[in-house]
């Protein structure tokens, strides 16, 4: 996992900028350099014919790194990322900008779902997209074809967006006050779960072509998400996919996760998805209004 491997160092390119961004949150020794194994580095736990490398406090394995060393590296990386995320969140709040982080495996239909969402939302308020991929700007071009501005972040070898990248991309977007910002993360059900970008919610998109047990195989992502969009439901008649089992698996990992069945092609669930966006946006704005009123009362008490 990239909280210990430093896979993206120096690889990121934000479209329109003429230099690459090194990630200061990845400045640490690479675990794949051969060195004597520390005493703490235990062999993987075995259960019958299976090997479990995700045991121990770090819940990960890297040759030559102890569990305590891996934990320190992870805390350093995520601590720096969280500071950038807090800065992003403050900027989003100042703009009354509602931000969603869309996460999924490759091929889940994120971009098709997003373009259809944009078309249905219309121009009632400002919209923008930050696109994350290892290479190309194909998805950003699809978004721009809808008339909505998009900034492409190419992560190179990196397998996720981080808050520092998003902060740079946000600086390239204008006139978003009171609007919606969608962040389409790199297709990956592992690493994006750990990285807060400053968003209001993570939305996990799972297509019915992937298998209903994905929430159990990749629990961190579904635990981090507030909503699961079960996508490509128009294909269900052609697949052996147990919808109820999938939802049960997701709620085993995260009892509070909401689930909406959607299809960009047939339109199923799109109204419910848009209503969820409006409801969550309204809840967040009302919470900010309440906080501002409380601040105003505190100031009035000083008069």
UniProtKB/Swiss-Prot annotation:
Superkingdom of the organism of origin: Bacteria
Keywords assigned: GTP-binding, Hydrolase, Metal-binding, Nickel, Nucleotide-binding, Zinc
Entry annotated with the keyword Metal-binding: yes
GO molecular function, one term: GTPase activity
Residues holding Ni(2+) 1: 2, 5, 7
Region called G-domain, residue ranges: 99-260
This protein's record includes keyword Repeat: no
Pfam family, one: cobW
NCBIfam families: hypB, PRK10463.1
Protein's job: Involved in the maturation of [NiFe] hydrogenases. Required for nickel insertion into the metal center of the hydrogenase. Exhibits a low intrinsic GTPase activity, which is essential for nickel insertion.
Protein name per the record: Hydrogenase maturation factor HypB
Species of provenance: Azotobacter vinelandii
Lineage of the organism: Bacteria, Pseudomonadati, Pseudomonadota, Gammaproteobacteria, Pseudomonadales
Gene designation per UniProt: hypB
């Amino acid at each position: 996992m990239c909280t210990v491997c430093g896979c993206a160092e120096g690889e990121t390119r934000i479209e329109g900028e003429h230099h690459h961004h090194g990630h200061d949150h990845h400045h640490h020794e690479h675990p794949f350099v051969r060195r004597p194994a520390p005493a703490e580095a235990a062999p993987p736990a075995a259960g019958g014919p299976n090997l479990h490398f995700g045991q121990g406090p770090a819940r990960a394995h890297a040759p030559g790194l102890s569990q305590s060393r891996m934990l320190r590296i992870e805390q350093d990386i995520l601590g720096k990322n969280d500071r950038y995320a807090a800065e992003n969140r403050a900027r989003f709040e100042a703009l009354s900008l509602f931000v969603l982080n869309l996460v999924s495996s490759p091929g889940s239909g994120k971009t098709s779902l997003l373009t259809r969402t944009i078309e249905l939302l219309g121009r009632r308020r400002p919209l923008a997209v930050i696109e994350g991929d290892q290479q190309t700007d194909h998805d950003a071009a699809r978004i721009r074809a809808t008339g909505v501005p998009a900034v492409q972040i190419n992560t190179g070898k990196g397998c996720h967006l981080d808050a520092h990248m998003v902060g740079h991309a946000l600086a390239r977007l204008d006139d978003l006050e009171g609007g919606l910002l969608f962040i389409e993360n790199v297709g990956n059900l592992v690493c994006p779960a750990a990285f807060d970008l400053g968003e209001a919610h993570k939305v996990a998109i799972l297509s019915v072509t992937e298998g209903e047990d994905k929430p159990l195989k990749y629990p961190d992502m579904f635990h981090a998400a507030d909503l699961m969009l079960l996508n490509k439901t128009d294909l269900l008649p052609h697949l052996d996919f147990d919808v109820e089992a999938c939802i049960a698996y997701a709620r085993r990992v995260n009892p509070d996760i909401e689930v909406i069945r959607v299809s960009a092609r047939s339109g199923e669930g799109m109204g419910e998805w848009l209503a969820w966006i409006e409801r969550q946006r309204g809840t967040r704005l009302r919470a900010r209004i309440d906080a501002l009123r409380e601040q105003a009362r505190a100031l009035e008490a000083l008069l």
